[in-house]
Design a protein with these regions (language model features):
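Ligand-binding pockets and gating/stacking loops
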Residues: 1-288
Length: 288
């Protein structure tokens, strides 16, 4: 079968609400490498950002007059490049066959999307950024271990949502080393590929337990952040899931899925039949 990536859930949401905030969406990743959880409508991965310090600066530190001038010049240059590309495509249009015209239409769509993003950046460039009490040093990338690092990520995500700097965030948690949880002897990846070895399963469970403790702390942060009409958690849909239901077997069925907040009437833990059940996409559509 011809299977290819298409648009991810977060980018569909960003299309609906991304124009209302300084940052259309954030694709964050603590796992390193080139992995991204976000994909545009052409199936191209959206670049991730794994640097908390640069994200903090982007969201909360105003640029100097010189920096703003350079950014304005960069955006103007971007418009100029797009204008040149549009002119070149127009001159080629009459010379192309049907299949090439289809490719050209994709390029024209990309140009229009880039133009929208440039205009959005221009609209925000001179507006003051929100001020937060937490200093940049709290979100230093020099965290002691993955547990500390993960909690710093959650704190930064909470600030981004609280200040309405963005309304769409994806955070890839990734694998961990054995630092941060006492008496762990093997890494997260090794433990996840346990092959039903009881000792590895026990260590894997301890990694998972710490992940969920950190996640629960993040939900507590959202609950404690009060807003008109409720808490930040009441006004935020938080989805935690995985691409694997059984990492040891690389099985992608029976995925663990956790939905919090958003004003839903949650019913606690729901276990569905592994064969006769509902598509996970039903939940995604409800979120949108």
């Amino acid at each position: 079968d011809d299977i290819r990536n298409t648009v991810s859930l977060d980018q569909v949401a960003a299309e609906q609400v991304g124009n209302e905030t300084r940052v259309r969406s954030l694709t964050l990743n603590s796992m390193g490498g080139a992995a991204s959880l976000s994909w545009n409508r052409k199936g191209v991965p959206v670049p991730k950002d794994g640097n908390r310090a640069s994200i903090y600066k982007r969201l909360f530190i105003d640029g100097t007059p010189e920096e703003i001038a350079r950014e304005t010049k960069r955006l103007a240059h971007g418009h100029s490049i797009l204008d040149d590309m549009r002119g070149q495509l127009k001159s080629l249009h009459s010379q192309l066959g049907a299949s090439d015209r289809e490719r050209m239409e994709l390029m024209e769509t990309s140009i229009r999307e880039a133009e929208v993003l440039l205009k959005q950046e221009e609209a925000w460039i001179a507006k003051p950024k929100p001020k937060v009490q937490e200093p940049a040093t709290i979100f230093s990338d020099k965290a002691g271990n993955w547990v500390d690092s993960q909690n710093r990520w959650y704190g930064l995500i909470r600030l981004a949502l609280q200040t309405d700097s963005t309304r769409v965030i994806v955070f890839g948690i990734g694998e961990h080393n054995n630092q941060g949880v006492p008496d762990l002897e093997i890494g997260h990846h090794d433990a996840s590929h346990h092959g039903k070895d009881p000792s590895k399963i026990e260590q894997f469970a301890r990694y998972e337990e710490k992940d969920y403790q950190n996640f629960a702390g993040f939900l507590d942060q959202l609950t404690e952040t009060k807003e008109p009409g409720g808490s930040l958690l009441d006004h935020t849909q938080v989805l935690l899931t995985s691409n694997l239901g059984d990492a040891s077997a690389h099985a992608s069925n029976n995925l663990p899925t956790f939905l919090a907040g958003g004003g839903y009437k949650h019913q606690g833990h729901l276990r569905f039949d592994e064969e006769n059940n509902y598509p996970l996409s039903n939940l995604y559509l409800r979120i949108l």
